């Protein structure tokens, strides 16, 4: 006990030093609205709620990001010491394509039936199949125009102070985490839904009145929750993910069941997605180790499967594997758990995670009894673009060659629909992988092939071209053309120290919201965004970044003329989803980009499009020379200390009006027939939904374009698509718009549907500045 207390005090002192004293850390805190005093207070909250180990992890991740960087053990001034740069010539000598052949009809097993056909919504996403489908058909395409609001529930007032919300370190330190992303579950006339301030609610699903409300000590049900079937509701249990494992809660009373697991908890790490409950075990997904099974009766650990492979003897790398944060589904007959996984870490730069990074960016099947991986299918190998698979896998049954077969489906950020046989993980259509570009970063070893699927047809292409540049106005077009000048674009172009890359897919394509499947026409419905991003890689200073260098000649001129944009420590400044970006100057003396400092005309030409002319005129050739020498001298010192590292990040490409840098529309709903692999219809959300004063000739600023869309489908032959504040219902066969309704706030989770006393209801959750539930029925 004494040892633990001493350790806690030491950790608190060290973390306090990191958060409060180090200047660059304070800047990062202030960027999200926290001053050092608030940061210190929140550190106490983190320690109290997360424990020592998780606090260390969070502080490392949030603040000392350079601990995860790829540090160099060689000198940048000695090119002979550089690690090998990949040979493009050698890459091009390989076969153009690699094909994984489709499964034959003889190999496929007979279908066990459509287990997703039910009228219950006892697990988020509609059940263990995650199909977001219901057999309910009282509300259908003929009468949907008669929908009316049955009830509304508001759990919070507007204008929440996000820093008063006690949750995980992630929740406290995140800039924008005030969304309920869990679609409610309904048992009889009880609805269960979390709130943004870490409460779990039980609401009367017919009247919208509150039954009970409990607050958990950790972030609650971020992406889903599950009810365990029980004929005696008073003894039934909810399994609720949190930032500290999964809670078992009595569904009737809302009390934590302290006699289960570890005082009502199983697992001890961040869990985002809905657990799977079987007769013998409860399956949960954790950020680490990955997938765990616990005894249903006692909460005792049965097995634990890690999908993360740590790099030996490397303190700079946290993860090199996959995190199952997107979702999972369960096949009762096969006793298989299907999981999608995240990308490898560190992101963007993979020097110290060589190889394909097995199990990352993959769809996997895990045996229920043993926890062993039965098979895995990787979409993107050695990911450098944040192309993880975020959408929950869907279990569906389709017909091929007059034979019904069971498949698992996952839609991806780059526009692919992974359609695999559930038994062996083989594709239903040939899966083609095309030869991919090499990297110009020393030591980076890219994957030779990346996906280029023909069927199912891609619902989106991740490649950005000049033709995609915005056409909203000439001013906005010119602004984007300037931002992509000298940018790399093309099929899986790799991150570079010399150039940005511009692409679609960093935030979707398809995201965690997932797709829905309707068995009536074997069609999957995919909501997605098509908004461009840029990936930037730069050198970073791992040791000397906080040194003042005021004794160096040129220091004052740099601080006066350059620091406001490039930062006092030369790291650059940017906003991930904003218009502003200023590049890092660290290590520029070792890059071709130094020509912009070596040549006064180059410097003026480049900056004339960025800073006011009157400010530019104040900088003479002599001033630039002093500034250049100052920067180069620091670079030499960093190199001498072998303190250079490399870092990568991404930011949304937006124009000067804060609109996405690509041509509208930006949000879509697409329908793909899984038996043919063909797109059968497409809906494009109108641009005027996201423009301020869109009726005027002069385009003003864009409103925030929603990052994600949501969907749910029913036997009534309708599919609901959600875009921002708007709910829209479509005919599943042709995509005709049947009905729409606009709420006061953006919706933040897929809808749920249920029936009670012969009446079908559909419920929607919207959140951010408040927490609203709006439920409809036929009038």
Per-segment meaning from a language model:
Residues 538-557, 573:
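Electrostatic cytochrome c docking/interface patches
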């Amino acid at each position: 006990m004494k040892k633990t207390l001493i350790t806690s005090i030491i950790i608190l002192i060290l973390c306090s030093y990191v958060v409060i004293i180090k200047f660059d850390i304070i800047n990062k805190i202030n960027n999200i609205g926290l001053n050092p005093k608030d940061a210190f207070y929140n550190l106490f909250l983190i320690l109290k709620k997360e424990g020592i180990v998780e606090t260390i992890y969070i502080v490392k991740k949030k603040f000392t990001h350079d601990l995860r960087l790829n540090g160099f053990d060689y000198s940048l001034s000695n090119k002979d010491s550089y690690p090998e740069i990949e040979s493009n010539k050698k890459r091009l000598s390989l076969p153009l394509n690699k094909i994984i052949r489709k499964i034959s009809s003889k190999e496929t097993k007979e279908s066990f039936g459509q287990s997703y056909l039910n009228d219950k919504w006892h697990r988020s996403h509609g059940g263990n199949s995650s199909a977001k489908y219901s057999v309910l058909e009282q509300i259908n395409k003929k009468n949907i125009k008669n929908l009316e609001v049955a009830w509304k529930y508001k759990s919070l007032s507007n204008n929440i102070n996000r820093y008063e919300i006690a949750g995980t370190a992630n929740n406290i330190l995140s800039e924008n985490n005030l969304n309920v992303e869990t679609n409610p579950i309904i048992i009889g006339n009880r609805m269960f839904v979390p709130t943004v301030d870490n409460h779990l609610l039980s609401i009367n699903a017919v009247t919208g009145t509150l039954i009970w409300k409990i607050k958990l000590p950790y972030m609650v049900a971020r992406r889903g929750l599950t009810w365990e079937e029980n004929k005696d509701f008073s003894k039934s249990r909810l399994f609720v993910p949190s930032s500290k494992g999964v809670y078992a809660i009595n569904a009737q009373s809302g009390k934590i069941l302290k006699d289960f697991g570890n005082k009502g908890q199983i697992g001890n790490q961040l869990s985002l997605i809905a657990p799977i409950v079987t007769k013998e075990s409860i399956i949960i997904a954790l950020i680490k180790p990955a997938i765990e099974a616990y005894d249903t009766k006692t909460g005792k650990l049965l097995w634990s499967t890690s999908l993360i492979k740590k790099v030996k003897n490397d303190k700079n790398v946290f993860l090199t594997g996959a995190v199952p944060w997107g979702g999972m589904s369960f096949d009762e007959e096969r006793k298989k758990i299907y999981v999608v996984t995240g990308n490898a870490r560190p992101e963007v730069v993979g020097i110290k995670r060589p190889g394909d990074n097995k199990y990352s960016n993959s769809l996997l099947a895990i045996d229920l009894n043993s926890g062993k991986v039965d098979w895995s299918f990787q979409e993107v190998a050695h990911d450098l673009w944040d192309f993880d698979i975020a959408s929950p896998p869907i279990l569906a049954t389709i017909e091929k060659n007059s034979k019904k077969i069971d498949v698992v489906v996952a839609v991806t950020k780059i526009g692919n629909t992974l359609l695999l046989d559930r038994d062996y993980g083989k594709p239903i259509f040939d899966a083609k992988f095309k030869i991919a570009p090499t990297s110009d970063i020393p030591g980076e070893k890219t994957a030779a092939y990346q996906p280029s699927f023909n069927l199912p047809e891609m619902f989106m292409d991740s490649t950005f071209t000049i033709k995609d540049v915005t056409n909203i106005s000439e001013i906005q077009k010119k602004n984007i053309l300037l931002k992509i000048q000298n940018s790399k674009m093309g099929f899986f172009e790799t991150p570079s120290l010399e150039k940005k890359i511009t692409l679609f897919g960093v935030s979707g394509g398809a995201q965690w919201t997932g797709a829905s499947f309707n068995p009536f026409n074997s069609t999957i419905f995919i909501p997605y965004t098509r908004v461009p991003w840029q990936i930037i890689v730069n050198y970073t200073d791992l040791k000397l970044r906080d040194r003042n260098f005021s004794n160096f000649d040129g220091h004052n001129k740099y601080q006066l003329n350059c620091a406001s944009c490039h930062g006092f420590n030369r790291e650059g400044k940017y906003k991930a989803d904003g218009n502003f970006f200023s590049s890092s100057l660290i290590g520029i003396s070792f890059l071709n980009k130094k020509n912009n400092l070596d040549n006064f005309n180059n410097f003026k030409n480049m900056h004339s499009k960025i800073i006011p002319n009157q400010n530019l005129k104040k900088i003479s050739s002599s001033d630039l020379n002093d500034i250049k020498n100052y920067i180069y001298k620091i670079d030499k010192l960093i190199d001498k200390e072998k303190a250079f590292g490399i870092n990568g990040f991404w930011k949304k490409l937006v124009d000067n009006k804060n609109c996405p840098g690509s041509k509208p529309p930006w949000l879509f709903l697409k329908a793909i027939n899984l038996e043919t692999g063909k797109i059968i219809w497409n809906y494009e959300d109108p641009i005027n939904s996201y423009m301020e004063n869109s009726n005027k000739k002069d385009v003003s600023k864009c409103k925030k374009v929603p990052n994600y869309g949501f969907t749910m489908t029913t036997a009534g032959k309708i599919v609901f698509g959600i875009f921002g504040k708007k709910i829209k219902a479509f005919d599943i066969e042709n995509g005709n718009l049947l009905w729409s309704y606009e709420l006061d706030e953006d919706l933040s989770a897929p809808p749920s549907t249920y029936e009670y006393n012969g009446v079908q209801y559909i419920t929607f959750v919207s959140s951010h500045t408040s927490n609203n539930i709006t439920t409809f029925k036929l009038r």
